[in-house]
């Protein structure tokens, strides 16, 4: 089947923003203008097309990034048809995993900011993630019709808070109630949208006289920014020659793709103004799959050997599975991004991570929650597959004859746990199936059984994260569950080195006995280094075949530390000496010896309890700053700074132990009459104060 749209006209873009900056509304408008939706879905009345899970529609926030395909020929129909694959990403901090995984498969992003709120805390997290994956981006300042809207203040914040390099390509005409449209700095014309046609019709007019000087000033800045793309353009510019429109667009495009600048636009998605111009900017400035470097991976058998795949239909097939969803009609859907080659439904693909071949069932192109079955997917496209049983998020799918392992995604460790049990015993098995399905979809969600209590423990990125998963269990799987109080994911480590500690497991009472003897040195590692085992046995005092057993004995002991049974992290064990018995030694005896030596060494190495510390940012009206700061301090928080918000008010940044943050949203609401909001994300582990550690140990009964 021939390609309908050349790959140069593909744009794989994400739309991401702080919660409530109007991102889903912006996406809705895009779907409307690109002709996919005939009636605009409003988030206000819970009808938005992209927010397709029931909880999202109730809460008015986006949780799962739905992928949608749309087509655009330009605002005035003056471009050849381009194909947009749009990924809507959530703005709530408990779902950063969703943002992270969509960033990985995008080629460009539109960052939506609120003209009143400006650069809010979550915007900084998203910006950092986009930097990490080197995603070229545009900035769109939304809600220009709101009281307190200020485009230029947001411009300043992008520079100071995000260290961004925004280049406005439009400036607003009016603001708040008086917001009418924008001045297009490329055309040097005013664009006024027709409200009766929901912004489908528009006209170019002369720039209002009172804005001429502002428009000239910002056009000059834009042209200067374009001239910096090459020496040749700079010479032309400094020589007083005019740069052509095509030269400016190409230069800004090159610099955007190199992540040197971010073209900046504005509008009000709700009032249907400005989104259309942003879509043109996506064509003008954001990359197609061929404008970015080829994807790289490694050889299946030799992880040092680097391979690359170009975005070309004739290359060998390679794709990345970036999301799993359970669909009520077709079962498990795996969303994947094709980096090279093409694939037909019914073809066999190879998953080098799982070392399994699988046959691809149906292939679906998604439009929010509607789907269209297609026969083949080409390089640069995003689609969903039915029938892959073994693939999970982050796996590579490739041509069985040309294996490649694309870089895996790194998922954060959960910081909060809760016990969960079904309301009726009959639902126990159903709950197990539901939880495993949800864990397959979301790698930052874990399920385990507590060996001591037999309880099912779920872990995730925050209270809201777990609340929504329990809610989904009820809606999608019909399992109602009770959840216990949130538990903090503490860790244990050591502060000193313990040398020459021995573990001896001996059972000799007639017949075949048991004999294992290991001597270890245990030392602390720097935070985040994890566990390391070094074999320093000389002269065969422990035979080679028993050394892995000693390591296994230690590794099996790591999940349950000696202080309060929490996982032990950041320690290094060196096996230095030991002895064996010709007849009585076996693997089991050495496993026991390793475990005994490790526990004894932990006792001698000054064990300490670590607690998760959270980066907390509170947005509050100025009147409440004292109250909020006092409250954070009472929660053992350390206030690290304060910023001004665009529309007045303050952002307070603090580091607070997670254990002190339970129920914070309720107390913040009552302390500020519901006018303050906060976000929180995991920062690092720190040693818990003695009184806290003792309380935790007492609660664990150790």
From Swiss-Prot:
Gene Ontology BP term (one): ribosome disassembly
GO cellular component: cytoplasm
Ribonucleoprotein found in the keyword field: no
InterPro entries: EFG_II, EFG_III, EFG_III/V, EFG_IV, EFG_V, EFG_V-like, EFTu-like_2, G_TR_CS
Keywords: Cytoplasm, Elongation factor, GTP-binding, Nucleotide-binding, Protein biosynthesis
Gene3D superfamilies: 3.30.230.10, 3.30.70.240, Elongation Factor G (Translational Gtpase), domain 3, P-loop containing nucleotide triphosphate hydrolases, Translation factors
One term of GO molecular function: GTPase activity
All copies of domain tr-type G, residue ranges: 8-290
Binding residues for GTP: 17-24, 88-92, 142-145
SMART domains (alphabetical): EFG_C, EFG_IV
Subcellular location, record wording: Cytoplasm
NCBIfam families the UniProt entry points to: EF-G (TIGR00484), PRK12740.1-5 (NF009381), small_GTP (TIGR00231)
Annotated family: Belongs to the TRAFAC class translation factor GTPase superfamily. Classic translation factor GTPase family. EF-G/EF-2 subfamily.
Function: Catalyzes the GTP-dependent ribosomal translocation step during translation elongation. During this step, the ribosome changes from the pre-translocational (PRE) to the post-translocational (POST) state as the newly formed A-site-bound peptidyl-tRNA and P-site-bound deacylated tRNA move to the P and E sites, respectively. Catalyzes the coordinated movement of the two tRNA molecules, the mRNA and conformational changes in the ribosome.
Name of the molecule in the record: Elongation factor G 1
Organism in which the protein naturally occurs: Cupriavidus pinatubonensis (strain JMP 134 / LMG 1197) (Cupriavidus necator (strain JMP 134))
Gene name, Swiss-Prot/TrEMBL: fusA1
